[in-house]
């Protein structure tokens, strides 16, 4: 994804060095249109080769900077195209990988997978949109980034009641 020759090899070498030193590793993957369909394969890879990591975090994209400027190429609506994400969570979980979801509003993930969601957006950059006003899960939901706008909207947002 970074498009740099040798980047994967370098990352793997450094992960193994850090892991062998006993350092806690939180591996983060930002969900994008470019990697969404490969997420189950990545879950298999992490399960087989990176068992020493402490946590694998899959993050919904924050609508700022490069992501915002390249929305059409990067934004992936996991609320309607759920299979890759859910499949990856199943694979990771079945293989003992501690996996969590950051920046995923609870209503955008099937009920079975909400246990992976974390209230991950800092208070100072967090907001709840109109659809959240009647949601019973608002207190345990990460909500949305302050700069989240209607043109960056997941299609399947609805209150959980």
Locate the predicted segments by residue.
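Radical SAM/AdoMet-radical enzyme domain recognition
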Residues: 1-59
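Radical SAM enzyme core and accessory elements
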Residues: 125-161
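Residue-level detector of alpha-helical recognition elements and their boundaries
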Residues: 13, 42, 71, 103, ...
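A C-terminal junction/extension of Radical SAM enzymes
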Residues: 24, 36-38, 55, 61-133, ...
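Short linear functional motifs in flexible/disordered or boundary regions
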Residues: 10, 39, 68, 100, ...
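Short, low-complexity, polar/charged sequence segments that are solvent-exposed and flexible
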Residues: 7-9, 45-48, 75-78, 118-122, ...
């Amino acid at each position: 994804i970074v498009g740099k020759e040798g980047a994967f090899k370098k990352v793997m070498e450094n992960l193994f060095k850090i892991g062998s030193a006993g350092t806690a590793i939180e591996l983060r993957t930002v969900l994008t249109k470019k990697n969404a369909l490969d997420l189950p394969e990545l879950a298999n890879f992490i399960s087989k080769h990176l068992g020493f990591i402490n946590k694998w975090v899959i993050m919904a994209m924050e609508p700022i900077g490069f992501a915002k400027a390249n929305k059409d190429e990067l934004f992936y609506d996991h609320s309607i195209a759920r299979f890759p994400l859910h499949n990856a969570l199943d694979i990771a979980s079945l293989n003992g990988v501690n996996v969590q979801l950051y920046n995923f509003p609870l209503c955008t993930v099937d009920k079975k997978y909400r246990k992976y969601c974390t209230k991950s957006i800092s208070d100072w950059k967090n907001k709840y949109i109109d659809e959240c006003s009647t949601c019973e899960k608002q207190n345990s939901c990460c909500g949305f980034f302050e700069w989240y706008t209607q043109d960056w909207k997941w299609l399947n947002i609805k209150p959980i009641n």
